[in-house]
């Protein structure tokens, strides 16, 4: 963000500090503890590099001895790389963090402030509900009109599991869904005519609305166990939203969310302020197979773009 003068820049910095403290106070009230991660990661310790970060946007640092390190590009990954090797299945942690991540963009290094929470080792549905509560509390603290977009990775992954797709086919379908290209998706799926979940996939783009509306829409389509698991998660969340008096006007359910689909293992969410196209909060469930033998550690979390909150408030004259 460009400033007219030093006073304006200092004011922006002070307001950023206040927002950070407000959110930190909320996390502490919910019994989260602060955890600090490193700015520099050893690439050999990256347990999740094959899941979420195949892009070329990472910033590499080459030492005098030729050893390659990476400037932190995601605090969650950095945090897990440090904690999971020593984790036992009875451990539990509610953590919050504040730090910087770095991404390469058009040969420039972009520095991004990131704040967030991770809930690791705790009961799945309870931590899902707590995430929704925290997200809603943060968003409504700054604006009345906002969107919390909720989905579940399990529904779409369940659909796709029926097709036995190769990588090219999989990526082509995901790309069509991302572009909301229903017409070409239907044409492409004709070759899978006998697959039970074909019709659900052809109509996945239309599975958007309130959680109640979406749950009604999916009733007429084939569902396998994985798809049902995702829908049951949404029912639980919908019941929680109604009971806790979270304003359902701000909630949109979208079963066609595909971002980092292979990384997530359940609830997914992202938030926006009205008339803004950049995410404020994003995250979801990413249960971890800690040893490769099926011992699963439940985990869910989200990150908050504090500077994006500030930019949005300044743009609207709300701050």
Residue ranges and their predicted role:
Residues 145-156, 173, 252-256:
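Short, surface-exposed recognition loops or helix-turn segments adjacent to catalytic cores
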Residues 111-115, 151-158:
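Short, conserved phosphate-binding/catalytic loop or strand-edge motifs used
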Residues 12-31, 35, 42-44, 57, ...:
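Positively charged, Gly/Ser-enriched RNA/tRNA-binding surfaces
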Residues 90-91, 142, 166-167:
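A short alpha->loop->secondary-structure connector
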Residues 38-69:
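Polyanion/phosphate-binding surface patch
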Residues 1-12:
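Auxiliary tRNA-acceptor-end handling modules of aminoacyl-tRNA synthetases
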